[in-house]
């Protein structure tokens, strides 16, 4: 984890087959500004002082720990396919 200029804690990034993930711990004061019943847009979470590269989406609310914001973004096509971009016409075995 790393600390930002605003005492927020940014997790290391982790991923699955579809997405890259990270979570951000905000301060108690900032957690009071987080909407209770909906996800935030990029404009909203940036206005709270969260700093990340473009493309991250606030994707989940974890009720017991409202000060932990969960983010994800799609993996790039080259990461999903191991460096080879596949055409949409490929037939796969399932």
UniProtKB/Swiss-Prot annotation:
List the coiled-coil residues.
none
Q: Does the keyword Nucleus apply?
A: yes
* Knockout mutant characteristics: Worms exhibit defects in the completion of maternal meiosis, embryonic mitosis and arrest in embryogenesis.
The molecular function terms of the Gene Ontology recorded here are: cyclin-dependent protein serine/threonine kinase activator activity; histone binding; protein kinase binding; ubiquitin binding
Q: State if Isomerase is listed as a keyword.
A: no
**Record's subunit section:** Forms a homohexamer that can probably bind six kinase subunits. Interacts with cdk-1.
Protein name per its UniProtKB record? Cyclin-dependent kinases regulatory subunit
Q: Which organism is it from?
A: Caenorhabditis elegans
